[in-house]
A protein has these predicted regions:
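P-loop (Walker A) phosphate-binding loop of NTP-binding proteins
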Residues: 8-9
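Electropositive, glycine-dotted interaction segments
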Residues: 69-168
Length: 168
């Protein structure tokens, strides 16, 4: 997609869609300097319930004719869950899933066997994935073998461009 245009009336949420897309891109690519840095998520503040709920984000995209779905559940401090699935057939295959364990204050990552990632590389990525950092951002800063994660990381780094929006 070379260009996209969003139409709508004033105050209908057009800029919020663009802000969410840019936030998602930065969540995938940016590695926080330390574990105490906020994730940057801003909850919906107009009702009491939403203020205290986690934000859920999901994006479907295609790379080399394969469908991927990347999902996050996060709040201002932690990424509570993150999953990446690929559709090489009609059924989804898990490339990884990550959950935050509040008892140990750490993330647990399960890599799918289809990813073909060595145990050493899995440990490296897991060690680099702090609570406010996506698995893909940690992968991008890790010296590990080439896998489908390269395709996804490179897609966000080279194909998904900065969003141009009013005030951005």
């Amino acid at each position: 997609l070379k260009i996209g245009i969003i139409y709508g009336t004033n105050a209908s949420g057009k800029t919020n869609i663009l802000n969410a897309m840019e936030f998602f891109r930065m969540l995938v690519l940016s590695m926080p300097k330390d574990r105490n840095k906020k994730t940057g998520v801003v909850p919906f503040l107009l009702d009491e319930t939403s203020r205290n709920e986690k934000t859920k984000m999901s994006m479907s995209f295609y790379i080399n004719k394969l469908k991927y779905i990347l999902s996050f559940e996060l709040d201002s401090k932690y990424i509570h869950s993150e999953t990446l699935f690929v559709y090489e057939s009609i059924r989804p295959t898990k490339l990884y899933s990550r959950t935050y364990d509040s008892n140990t204050d750490s993330s647990v990552i399960e890599f799918g066997s289809n990813l073909k990632l060595s145990k050493k590389s899995q440990d490296t990525i897991s060690g680099n994935t702090i609570n406010n950092c996506s698995v893909l951002a940690a992968f991008g800063k890790s010296n590990v073998e080439k896998t489908k994660l390269n395709d996804v990381y490179d897609y966000f780094a080279m194909q998904v461009k900065d969003v141009l929006a009013p005030g951005m």
